[in-house]
Amino acid sequence: MSSGVQGGSAANANAYQTHPLRDAASALGTLSPQAYVDVVSAAQRNFLERMSRLASEQCDAQPVTDDARLDRLDDKPALRAPRSDAAHAADGNARGNGGASGAAKLTELLGVLMSVISASSLDELRQRSDIWNQMSKAAQDNLTSLSDKFQCATDDAKAATDAAERAAAAAKQAAADAKAADAAADAAQKRYDDAMKQGLPDDQLKTLQAALEQAKQQAGDAHARADALQADAAGKLDAATALATQAREWEQQIDDAVNQASRQYGASASLRTPPSPKLSGAAELTAVLGKLQELISSGNVKELESKQKLFTEMQAKREAELQKKSDEYQEQVKKAEEMQKTMGCIGKIVGWVITAVSFAAAAFTGGASLALAAVGLALAVGDEISRATTGVSFMDKLMQPVMDAILKPLMEVISSLITKALVACGVDQQKAELAGAILGAVVTGVALVAAAFVGASAVKAVASKVIDAVAGQLTKLMDSAIGKMLVQLIEKFSEKSGLQALGSRTATAMTRMRRAIGVEAKEDGMLLANRFEKAGTVMNVGNQVSQAAGGIVVGVERAKAMGLLADVKEAMYDIKLLGDLLKQAVESFAEHNRALAQLMQQMSDAGEMQTATGKLILRNARAV
């Protein structure tokens, strides 16, 4: 029995378990061609040695004349019938004649078998070994080429990563320098503002202003340098990312080639490489990608913080400007309202003075003029009462047709001509319209003043239109319920307040005053009345011009207020735009993080594939 029994007792062992070539047979699936040749040659030698040993043992244990015993190769005794002397003699003659024994025949058979096996099996195995070596050589060359390319890509990625690290450090230092320059500029600005508040001499102010300008220039240069270095760092980081991705692709090709070679050639010793004490291949690429991820993450965080700080500062400045513009807008609106109230009060005062002058002039003429003056005084008092009780001025309604039919068309025509002339000269349309409206109102007022001094012949048409418009509107007003109510109100007011008695007493007093100053003739009274009328006309024109000028001033103030309101809206839009930019920066940061997560996932997949390949090789690596 063989002594090579492994795993179990001899009673439970089968023939395969006790066979001396069991271990060699189990390794046939993982051997190279040369190993196959060695295994088969060893099996042949073991077989021939075993057969020769059995033949020698049989030959030594039995005499030569015992043919039956020589035909058996085991240790069992051979039983046979007794033989005669004649048979013994014949057998001896046969041996003497040179007959071959069983051991000799077995040796001859084994020699022929060995010759046949050596001639066929070894030649076939040698051919297969040559084919295997050629295929293995091609696979090794392919793997070597891929490995060289992968190593070059890894080295380039590592160099690019180092360059990106240096660029990031330079950008960080430049950002710190820019921050320091901003602090210096703020300090210079504060010193200059303090000097302005303290009222220092002009020489010191000029020196501080020059220092402030220099600090601002240095801060601007520092920011420009920081932006340039930041852009350079971002470019180098992108280049490093691209090279790392390329190295990852070469690594994937190497993994595919190794897996294909493992499936095709098995875990051959010729495909195995000795372990290296330093990081190589996927491990080195993983280290490079990890460092690259750290750089990208750090750069993204710093970029987001920088943008957030910049946007916050810009937003704070715009909010301060917005508050300032809002305060200025409120101030301009308040000034316009005060100006409008002031001009209204002035107009009322001048109107009452004109009414008084007209009433005084009527005293020298008497008769119908005095009655008209009383009517004018009553209308003025009634207009104030109506404005106080109802909030509506019927005198404004009476003058509205005059404005609509005469003054407004005239102002619009003059304003249109001035606007077209300004636009033809290259002035902006909006500014030309504003200037045309202001100049149109001024020219119209000047034209009315000139017409008043030129004479009645020049304003006859205008006066007729005014009289017709006022008469028609007055007739409609008197026929309406408002007019009737106004008449009743004036009558009651005159009765209660003694306005009629006041009128008669005033006429008597004026007659006495006329006599006292020596105006007895009618011509003298008419002369004084004409002078009073001229003075009233001049004052009325002056009132209208002052009201127009006041309206222009109020319009200018309102235009300034509208400009401030436009600035406020622009500042609000800038604040909204800054918020949108900050939102885009956050989205870009999230996108970069997603890209990094995908890159790390690919690295993890590559490591998992490499681990699976190593496990496959270890499972197929068996001892021969």
UniProtKB/Swiss-Prot annotation:
Main localization (coarse): secreted
Transmembrane regions listed in the UniProt entry: 359-379, 405-425, 434-454
Transmembrane among keywords: yes
UniProt feature, compositional bias: Basic and acidic residues: 66-88
Coiled-coil regions listed in the entry: 313-343
Gene3D superfamilies: Nucleotidyltransferases domain 2
InterPro entries, per the entry: BipB-like_C (IPR006972), IpaB/BipB/SctE_N (IPR032391), T3SS_SctE/BipB (IPR003895)
Keywords: Coiled coil, Host membrane, Membrane, Secreted, Transmembrane, Transmembrane helix, Virulence
Gene Ontology cellular component terms for the protein in this record: extracellular region; host cell membrane; membrane
Keyword Coiled coil: yes
Subcellular location: Secreted; Host membrane
Start and end residues of each stretch annotated as Disordered: 54-99
Primary role: Plays a role in the bacterium-induced formation of multinucleated giant cell (MNGC), which is formed after host cell fusion, as well as in the intercellular spreading of bacteria and in the induction of apoptosis in macrophages. May act in concert with other effector proteins to induce fusion of host cell membranes.
Family, similarity comment: Belongs to the SctE/SipB/YopB family.
Protein name: Translocator protein BipB
